[in-house]
From Swiss-Prot:
Keyword presence, Isomerase: no
Family: Belongs to the universal ribosomal protein uL6 family.
Gene name of the encoded protein: rplF
Lineage start: Bacteria, Pseudomonadati, Pseudomonadota, Betaproteobacteria, Rhodocyclales
GO cellular component, one term: cytosolic large ribosomal subunit
Entry annotated with the keyword rRNA-binding: yes
Assembly and oligomerization: Part of the 50S ribosomal subunit.
Name this protein carries in UniProt: Large ribosomal subunit protein uL6
Annotated signal peptide: none
Keywords linked to the UniProt accession: Ribonucleoprotein, Ribosomal protein, RNA-binding, rRNA-binding
A GO molecular function held by the record: rRNA binding
InterPro entries listed in its UniProt record: Ribosomal_uL6-like, Ribosomal_uL6-like_a/b-dom_sf, Ribosomal_uL6_a/b-dom, Ribosomal_uL6_bac-type, Ribosomal_uL6_CS
Pfam families reported for this sequence: Ribosomal_L6 (PF00347)
Record-linked PANTHER family: 60S/50S RIBOSOMAL PROTEIN L6/L9, LARGE RIBOSOMAL SUBUNIT PROTEIN UL6M
Amino acid sequence: MSRVAKNPVAIPQGVEITIGADEVSVKGPLGAVKQYIGNAVTLERDGDALVCKAREGVANSRAMSGTVRALVNNMVTGVTKGFERKLTLVGVGYRAQAQGDKLNLTLGFSHPVVHQMPAGVKVETPTQTEIVIKGIDKQQVGQVAAEVRAYREPEPYKGKGVRYSDEVVVLKETKKK
């Protein structure tokens, strides 16, 4: 059995969880999130905790119980603390500027790159070379960060490009004559 699913999800004060037939919704101080969980797993409330149990006779139910538990835990964390991903621009003339729900990037192309943020995701630029993406949905925050990074991934010789702030880019050695 999945060891992840054995641990219950703690429900902090101010968080409201609604369990439907095949979906769960979590509402907290930062907002609300919904997630489809299917019929392989049952969620039961046990005081101030939520327990994930695999359904008997359903294929992959034991495997999905750990996944659903992790998703619900991320939802609870998202509506209480939120998630953020930091990106850094490395390169001469590479700049970022947040304008409302848009992110303007100057990445050495002949044109500026404008990335539209989806609903529920906010972007900040503390400096011209730092980008902070925040939101309550962990998957969505990570997806937006990956899309922004994909505009100019770090190249292997000088390391120029958009990288995660905690990313280590291994540089290659140049060709010797």
